[in-house]
Amino acid sequence: MKRFKGRVAIVTGSAQGIGRAIADRLSSEAAIVCYADINGDGAAAAAKEADGGRAFAVGCDIGEPESVAALHKAVVDKHGKLDVLVNAAAIVPFVPWDDLTFDEWRRVMRVNLDGCFLMCREAIALMRENGYGRIVNISSNSIFAGTPNMAHYVASKGGILAFGRALATELGADKITVNSVCPGLTDTEGVQTTPHKDAFDFVEMLQAIKGHGTPQDIVPAVAFLASEEAHWITGQALAVDAGMIRW
């Protein structure tokens, strides 16, 4: 399948985890993918291994405006446009409320929410030039579940969803769609470094479909929303969590 042939995409957080799985999928379907990550070496290694042969990497701190501007300039200088943005970069913390400091709050907001804003600000300007765009933001099903011990993370991911819906309203006339995918607990490198690694069996009991989520389970929904086929869908939130959240 080559449904992204001729399309240029940026995927943040693509050195590992869900971001990398998404970038790999878009690349395998003929997109020209920029693997963007604060871990520039990791992004470069991932891009080198990508199927399709046209991937490249740019190191980027998405919480830093100058770094985000430089990323988009690099993409335009190399390929002349931007069609697809997937905001997958995130910090996944585990901090009980009584231990949550303002500095920790800001650390998470800087990456998860500020980063999404900064990436969208640069990307939308480029997409408007072409009269086409797909933005897919990775939120979380924790915003519906009220997951404890990570209030700042939940707030940041809820902000991403609300932000995306507001953008969708403003950008429809520009033929730019903005949607959110809300994964459940997913077995990634980041999760394995937190206490969440011990929660899979409990979460499985809440799921309609049994099993442990992997990055590959999230990819198809993102790829669809990033494609031309999803032109009539915007401002939506799709929980991809084996039916843990049902409404």
Where are these regions (language model features)?
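Catalytic Tyr-X3-Lys loop
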Residues: 91, 98-118, 132, 136, ...
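Active-site helix of classical SDR
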Residues: 120, 156, 164
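Alpha-helical segment proximal to the catalytic Tyr-Lys
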Residues: 125, 169-173, 231
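Substrate-binding pocket helix/loop in short-chain dehydrogenase/reductase
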Residues: 96-97, 104-106, 191, 203
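Residue(s) in the substrate-gating loop at a strand-loop-helix junction
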Residues: 140
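Conserved glycine-rich Rossmann-like NAD(P)H-binding loop of the short-chain dehydrogenase/reductase
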Residues: 29-45
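Active-site loop immediately N-terminal to the catalytic Tyr-X3-Lys motif
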Residues: 95-98, 145-151, 173-174, 210, ...
